Amino acid sequence: MLVDNQTSTTTNLVGTKRKSPENDFIMTIDIAGDDDFVDDDENDDDEDLKEDFFFEESDKPQLPWDFAPTIEKMKQQTHKKTDGQTSLEDKINQRKTVKKLKADDDKSVTTKTTNNNKSKKSNNNDNDDDDEEVNEEEEEEEEEEDNENEKEINKKQQQQQQQSNKQTTDKIKVLQSNRKLKKIVEEELPTFEELHLSRPLLKAVQKLGFSQPTPIQAKAIPLALNGKDILASASTGSGKTAAFLLPVLERLLFRDSEYRAIRVLILLPTRELALQCQSVMENLAQFSNITSCLIVGGLSNKAQEVELRKSPDVVIATPGRLIDHLLNAHGIGLDDLEILILDEADRLLDMGFKDEINKIVESCPTNRQTMLFSATLNDEVKTLAKLSLQQPIRVQVDALMQVTSTLEQEFVKIKPQHLSDRPAILLSLCTRVFNQGGTIIFCRSKKEVHRLRIIFGLSDLKAAELHGNLSQEQRFDSLQQFRDGQVNYLLASDVASRGLDIIGVKTVINYNMPNNMANYIHRVGRTARAGMDGKSCSFITDNDRKLLKDIVTKARNKAKSRSVSQDNVNFWRNRIEELTEDIKSIVREEMKEADLRKAEKTLDKAEKIISNADANVETPKVWYKTKQEEDKSKELWKIENNIVNPGKKLKAPIDVTGVNNVPSIKKLKQKKDPYYGLSRKQRRHRQFKEEFEREQQEERKRKGGDDGDDNEEIDSGKMFERSQRAQKSSGKETKRIESLRRNYMAGGALTDQEKQRVDNKKSKKNKRMIVNKKEKKQRLSKK
C-alpha cells in the first residue's frame, strides 16, 4: 500500500474528528494517472504490520464464535455439586427406565399366567389318556389366539406411529394483502479489499468465510474509519457486529502500543451477546496483538477486575457490571476512551438500562467517537442519540420494521376452545415437519419454557432451554450444544431474540406471539440471516389478529396459514396426558433442590462472615441503584411493555423521578402550564375571569381609581358572576326550546329513558345549586 508521509505517523486516536492531516488515521492511497502499484519486498512487511502476524492456509472456514473455552473456565470456578442433586436429563432418563421396567414386568406377568394355565390343563389331562389329542388341539388354538393378539397390538402401535408421522393431512393456504410491494433495486457492493482494510484483517475475514461485505458494512466502515459519529439502523442478520468491529480493529493496528489504555468500549444488552461479540472479535484480531476483555455478570468479579487493571484495548461489557467496576474498583476509569459503541440500543433501553447508559456516557470524554447501532429507531433511541452523538451521519439499510426477503412465514391459527392443545400442536409439527434440527422455539414465560423442555425430553426429542432462571454456565452450555448440533431444538425466552448469530438455524417457532412488531422481527431474525433461506411458524390466537394483519401487509413474500390435522393433535394430547405425573414429580424434585441450594448459599455467607470477622473491615460496596429502585424500574418497564396491567396494585410505589432526583414530569408541566389539571370548562371559566378582571382594571386606570380598593374588587367579581349567569340562562333557554320542539315534532309523550335523563339533569342542577350556596356562605364568612 502506498501511504502518505503525513498519515503514516502514529498519534493518539482522540483527535480523529479533526480535519488536520496529522491526526487523521485513514490510510490514503495516491493513485496517479498512469502509475501502477509495486509489490513490496518481504523485508518491508515488518514496517507495515505488527509483530506476531502469521498466516496459515486453511480450507475450512472458521466459525465466528465459540463458547467452549469460557464454559471450561466457569466450570473450574464453580463449586462441586452437592449430594442428592441430579441434572434434568438424569431425571428424565430415570422416568424412562422406570417405564421400560414396568412394561417388561407386565409382559413377564402375562407370560407366567399363560404358562400356569397351560400347566394346570396339562396336569388335569394326564389322568385321561384318551383326551390327549383334544388337549393338543386346544393348546394349538390358544397359541394361535396369542399370536393374533400380539399381531393386533403391533398393528395398533404402527397405526399410532403412522398417525403421528402423517405429513399430507396438513392444509396450507396463502394469505394475501392488498398492498403492492415495491421493486427492490440491488446495488453493487465493494469488496473488503476496496474498503482499505489491512492485510491481517483481510486474512482473518477470509478465514472466517466472509466473501463480500453486507450493505451495512459497506456503508458504515468508511464512515467509521473517518472518525465520524454514526447512527445506523438495519434489519437483524445484516452483519452489524462486523460493521463496527472491523473499523475499530483497523484503527487500533496503528495505535501507540507502548501506552496502555482502554481505548474502545462496546456496550451490549445481554451476556450472550457480549460473549458472542468478544468471540467474533478474537477471531478477527487473531493475526494482531490487540487485547480485549469481557465484563458481564455471572462471572468472577475479581478476575474481571484483574483484567481491567491490565488496560486492554477493547472492553466488551453489559451496563450493570461495568458500572459496578467503575464505582468500586480503584484506579479503573474511562478517561482515555476514544471510541464508544452502543450495539442493540433499542434493546438496551427496553431492558431498563437508560440511567446506566447516561451515567456511562457522562463518564466518557467528550472528544470521543460514538457509534450507535439498532434494528429499530423509536423515540427513545433518537433521544439517546441526541445525548451521546455529535453531528451523526445516519446510515439506514432496508426498510424499518420489515423482515428479510428470504424468509418464508407460516401461521397456525388456534381457536379459543383449543388453546390447551398448543403443546400437542407443537409436538406434532416438530416430529413431522420441523424434524431436521436447527429449530428455535420462543415462549413468553420461563415456566412454559421449562415445562416444554421436560415434555420434549420425555418424548425422546433432543432439546435445550435458555432463559433467565438458568445459571450463566447453563445458558452458555445450551447455546454451545445447539451450535454444535448436539441438540435439535432450543426452547428460549426473549433472551435469545436479539443479536445471536447461530449458524444453521432453519426455522423459528413462536409458541407465544410477542407484544409488538419489533419483537416479532427480532425473533424471526434468528433465521434467514446474511442472505440464507429460513422459515418461521407462529401460533396465532384471537388476541393476535391485529399483529397478524401488520405482518401480512409488510411481508415481502406471501405468507401462508397451516391447519394441523386433528388426528395428530389427538395423538399427542393423549401422550402428554400420560406424562403429567412424571412432569409434576420432576418439578417437585427441582423445587426441593432449589431450596437446598438456597440453604447452602446462606451457610456459605455465614461462614465467610465468621471467618472474616477478625480481619480488617473492608470498605462498603457502592451500588448505583438500591434493590427498591431496581424493583421500581422493573415494574415501570413491565408496564411500558404491557406485561403488567397499570391498574394492578404494585408492591412498591413507583417513583418516576429516577435515581438522580430529577423533577417529575407532572411538576415540570405544572410550572409551565398554569391551567394544568383543570378540565376544559374550568380552564375557560378561569380565562374569562382573568380577561374580565384585566378589562376592569384598565377602566379603573382610565377613570383614575385606586387599584387596591377592596370594594371595587368585590364589584368586579359580582359583575363577572352576573355575566356568566346571563350566558348560562340564555344557553338553558335555547336548550329548553329545542327540547320542546323535538317533543312536539315526535308527537307523543316522553319515553322512560328520556324521563330518566331529564330527572338526572334536574338532580344534578339541584346539587350544584346547593354546593354553590355553601361556597358563597363560606366566602362571605371569611371576608
Curated annotation (Swiss-Prot):
Motif window: Q motif: 190-218
Region described as Disordered: spans on this chain = 1-20, 56-173, 665-783
Q: Tell me which PROSITE patterns the record gives.
A: DEAD_ATP_HELICASE, HELICASE_ATP_BIND_1, HELICASE_CTER, Q_MOTIF
Q: What reactions does this protein catalyze?
A: ATP + H2O = ADP + phosphate + H(+)
Recorded superkingdom: Eukaryota
Name listed for the protein in its UniProt record: Probable ATP-dependent RNA helicase ddx27
Basic residues bias: where?
762-783
Q: Which PANTHER family does the record match to this protein?
A: ATP-DEPENDENT RNA HELICASE DBPA, ATP-DEPENDENT RNA HELICASE RHLE-RELATED
